[in-house]
């Protein structure tokens, strides 16, 4: 094999992309991964890390460009770790994401006949985030900086704009940054674990335009909070809630468990279809509201509700998808391990006068067995777990429940594919639809339909 040495400069042709969007060049059979390179490009690159089984390269020059290459519109793209695909046309991004799902499911397990649909994309794949979590720090000259982390680090890149964030969030960020400097409010230092302001979090209701601003602080004492509240109220009249979240932990967790309302309401409202949701500072709510409606509509299509079905919504959170389906179901049962989320789900059901809903707090595998013993037989089960996927205990319990259809929403197709192999014992994985919830990034969301084998 040809010798591979660190700091060596080489040329080669990109033959594939990794799940991180990195170009793959092979020397003999040895893979080299190069960020920002595209398939079929002839490139010059420098080897910056060499391991036994792979190497990492840095792109120096594109000798022969792909038709899929575009100039990234963001001035921070080369440094910021928030986006990975701005150098790629949006059509190519959608194709890449579908291809990754195809590779996962058609090459592993009994899923070669599963239909993988085209990725559902956005008309305008920018400014889509309804929630911004912005780290706060200080420069070497002790000026307040706000932005996002440099790739693979906790170094904050001071930014005035971000093209995937809501435009209003940027305006709030820039004004708060100015006021923190003006008022000389202390900023949290990750190394010394001292200082007050850790993060600024902004949430907006996509359909209501209500805005919530959250100051995440290292401790409860926030002497100048009233000054900041008054400035925000005056400059941004659509702010309906300002909160302080206390996070004393010395970890990468952004928000703590304790919050207090400094101004306005405890929650903001948003709508999906005809359903209104109350969203708190700690609520899980999909980041991309317009794509969430497409995601949930596809899930609804797979569920094929006629009004006679009992629906079980596992990992239900604040009830978003269960309440979305409730108007078309006989009854919706939701289960979630987080007590506050269940309270929010019940409040949301009451707000929308959806009386055909029941929510219970507990582990899904325990609660659904209790419901089964009470004679509750769901025809459709909704599954929407965190990135780690489903616990095996839950999946084996789900097989005992034996519903006709399972609709599985995933933010991590790798764990979805792992879980699908367990469900394949009794279910046919009929179809998967990727939905692009996070344009310009490598993240993929999918919704999959499983049908009981005796129902095919």
From Swiss-Prot:
CDD domains attached here? AdoMet_MTases
Q: Which residues form the active site?
A: 411
- Name the InterPro entries for this protein: MeTrfase_TrmA_AS, MeTrfase_TrmA_CS, NA-bd_OB-fold, SAM-dependent_MTases_sf, TRAM_dom, U5_MeTrfase_fam
Q: Which domain of life is it from?
A: Bacteria
User: What does the record give as EC number?
Assistant: 2.1.1.-
- What family does the Swiss-Prot or TrEMBL record give for this protein? Belongs to the class I-like SAM-binding methyltransferase superfamily. RNA M5U methyltransferase family.
Entry protein name: Uncharacterized RNA methyltransferase SERP1435
Give the organism the record lists: Staphylococcus epidermidis (strain ATCC 35984 / DSM 28319 / BCRC 17069 / CCUG 31568 / BM 3577 / RP62A)
UniProt lineage = Bacteria, Bacillati, Bacillota, Bacilli, Bacillales
